[in-house]
C-alpha cells in the first residue's frame, strides 16, 4: 500500500479501509487532446496495431477505485447468473470481497493500512481448492439488534475449510474525510 494512501482507523474505532486494490502504475486512458504528457507511457499500449500515446501509467485512488468497482461488478454478476440471487445486497457482496481478500503481509490482518487485504475476485467466488462450487449461506431476513444474538449450526466435513464473515452496511460518516 503506497504511503500516499489514506488509512484508518475511524474516529469511532472501525477498521478502514475494508480492503485495498491495486492503484500504482496502472495503464489508463489519456485524452488525445490533453496538453500534459506527464506520467509514464504504457509502452505496450497499441491502437489498431500501432503503439499509441493514448494511454499512460497513473497512480492513485482513481485507479484503485476502478479496479475495485470492476471486481465488485463481477461478483454481483456471479451472484445473479451462477448463484441465482437476482438482487444481491451490498452486505453480501462486501462479505465475499472480504472473504476473498489476500493478506499483503505484515502487520496481520485486519489492519488500518490494508483492512482485510487486497481484493481478489477469484478467491471471492471460487473455493481455494476449486474442487467444489462456492456454497453460500447468508441470512438477510433479520436484523441483529444490540444485546441480541442468533445461533446457526453447521455440519462440516473435517477436511473442508469454512470462511465466515459478519458484515453490515456502515452508517454515513462525516463529509470531511479526515473526520470519519
Question: What is the predicted role of each segment?
Answer:
Residues 10, 25, 62, 117-119:
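Gly/Ser/Thr-rich beta-alpha loop segments that engage phosphate groups in nucleotides
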Residues 1-29, 98-101, 163-171:
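Catalytic-core segments of hydrolase enzymes
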Residues 15, 22, 93, 150, ...:
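Residues that flank catalytic or metal-binding motifs in active/ligand-binding sites
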Residues 6-9, 31, 63, 124:
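Short capping/connector residues at structural and topological boundaries
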Residues 4, 19, 56, 66, ...:
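Short glycine- and Lys/Arg-enriched binding-loop motifs that mark or flank ligand-binding interfaces
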Residues 88, 110-179:
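Secreted peptidase-domain scaffold signal
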Residues 1-3, 33-36, 113:
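Short secondary-structure boundary/capping segments
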Residues 23-107:
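Hydrolase catalytic cores
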Amino acid at each position: 500500500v503506497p504511503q500516499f494512501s489514506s488509512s484508518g482507523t475511524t474516529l469511532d474505532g472501525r477498521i478502514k479501509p475494508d480492503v485495498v486494490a491495486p492503484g500504482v502504475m496502472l495503464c489508463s486512458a489519456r485524452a488525445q487532446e490533453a496538453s500534459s504528457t506527464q506520467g509514464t507511457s504504457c509502452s505496450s499500449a497499441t491502437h489498431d496495431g500501432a503503439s499509441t500515446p493514448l494511454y499512460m501509467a497513473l497512480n492513485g485512488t482513481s485507479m484503485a477505485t476502478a479496479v475495485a468497482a470492476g471486481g465488485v461488478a463481477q461478483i454481483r454478476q456471479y451472484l445473479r447468473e451462477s448463484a441465482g440471487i437476482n438482487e444481491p445486497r451490498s452486505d453480501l457482496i462486501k462479505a465475499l470481497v472480504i472473504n476473498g481478500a489476500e493478506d499483503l503481509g505484515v502487520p496481520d490482518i485486519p489492519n488500518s493500512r490494508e483492512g482485510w487485504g487486497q481484493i481478489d475476485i477469484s478467491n471471492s467466488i471460487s473455493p481455494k481448492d476449486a474442487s467444489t462450487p462456492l456454497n453460500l449461506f447468508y441470512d438477510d431476513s433479520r436484523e441483529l439488534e444490540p444485546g441480541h444474538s442468533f445461533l446457526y449450526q453447521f455440519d462440516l466435513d473435517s477436511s473442508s475449510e469454512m470462511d465466515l464473515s459478519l458484515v453490515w452496511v456502515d452508517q454515513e460518516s462525516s463529509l470531511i474525510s479526515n473526520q470519519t
